[in-house]
């Protein structure tokens, strides 16, 4: 289900986790890897393909995944990009059942100024978020380790940031089980 306005959002009847990141960071690919459903979230090589809030109910669970529009570069007119930005900020500030946002960072590029600005939005809205490095198969293991440390240092003083940085590769499935376990740990105990 896609939402282009707040009044199109699904009922807040289950826990939600959202995926945010710059355009082409690998949000859709990671969502597909996490759910083991190749075509669930539409992945594209075209930056700015996701143009609405996309909601995916996870089968057999009390969880909904939200794919947020990419920020930064997008092949869309400026007023359209501004509309996505307003919608995303309003969603983040007002969604009572949003448990955590996973902020995806392309490991080839690391944290950029635009990522720090979105972290400011999360911090101001008191939305818990966790940094997830993507595409780690594209850089050497020592560089991944260094990037995890550098990123951890940069988020250490941020009030809403979860301190653990997760490194993933959707292509090789690296870190996907760890991220899935983090998400499952957020769910209420069903026992």
UniProtKB/Swiss-Prot annotation:
Keywords associated with the record: Cell cycle, Cell division, GTP-binding, Magnesium, Metal-binding, Nucleotide-binding, Septation
InterPro entries in alphabetical order: G_ENGB_dom, GTP-bd, GTP-bd_ribosome_bio_YsxC, P-loop_NTPase
Domain of life: Bacteria
A GO BP annotation: division septum assembly
Binding site for GTP: 21-28, 48-52, 67-70, 134-137, 168-170
Pfam families linked to this entry: MMR_HSR1
Residues annotated for Mg(2+) binding in this entry: 28, 50
Source species taxonomy: Bacteria, Pseudomonadati, Pseudomonadota, Alphaproteobacteria, Maricaulales
Required cofactor(s): Mg(2+)
Protein name: Probable GTP-binding protein EngB
GO MF: GTP binding; metal ion binding
